[in-house]
């Protein structure tokens, strides 16, 4: 929820309290997602779990909207984190199953594009009409959307999530596959900064006197420019090679954070948002391909889970908690400066790993 930090600040919570509430979501999600996976796989109830999770998010958001007490919000935040954890994974599996049944599996990119368009419309509308005077309404809106999603999920076909995640075996990879371990260190450092920007961008824009519509446009730009770039990944890799595409995409992040630290005109933030799309294309497509070719097939699901944990679980959780404390004591500029340092370190680590241990020759054939 891109506006949650802004809402929590508006009701008077301290930076530390905000950091705790924000950090819980990726951390809990990381911890419970394997449990959801086991429940779904063993009982073959992926669709039922998706429906239940959507309705669970609905309940948690109704609770969130009904109180400003920190302890109660902590409870509803944990509930929300637990319930939202399986939605992305199972939703993707169901979508792919539907497309495969209709001989349209290559159309998955189009579905993702519609998701980005929906997100762009939502964040622009919230930014333009709710942020300035009625930000509380993000919770009822989010709740209703998840309730509707649960109803829609009742009608979609069943699907199996293929690729067993062996967590014990996966963790042992960090000791056996040193290349993967080094790579994940860099990804972890990058993940710290991404968790912060996903939650504090709205706070930052308000701090530099940005209007609600500017916040909405900034978030919409990030979403709308992401998918077209992802669709061009095979072309980029064929022309420049996977190493350059991966490292160059990640390298824009320290530049982005540094620019944030020194910009005080909210309109100048808008063109910088394109850098987000470049980086996410690298991290959500190219880096995944790189990790996939480091491992034998039976360990790829576990390797990808470790990658996701570093980028979207442990990294963001630590970053969000630290950002709350730093923001309270020193303001948002120092947050961005430290993000620049972390992202630069992460970029250097990733660059060293991918150039020291280049992709296997067969990888290029697979990508092409």
Predicted segments, located by residue:
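Juxtamembrane intracellular "pre-TM" segments in multi-pass secondary transporters
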Residues: 155-187
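Hydrophobic core of transmembrane alpha-helices in multi-pass small-molecule transporters
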Residues: 60, 70-87, 188, 268-282
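Cytoplasmic helix-loop-helix junction between adjacent transmembrane helices
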Residues: 78-114
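Helix-to-loop junctions at the C-terminal end of transmembrane segments
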Residues: 31-45, 130-131, 228-241, 327
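C-terminal membrane-cytosol helix-exit motif in multi-pass small-molecule transporters
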Residues: 126, 138-161, 349-354
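A membrane-interface helix-boundary motif in multi-pass transporters
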Residues: 128-144, 325-343
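Helix-loop boundary and gating motifs at the non-cytosolic
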Residues: 1-26, 179-218
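Structural signature of the two symmetry-related core transmembrane helices
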Residues: 48-62, 143, 244-259
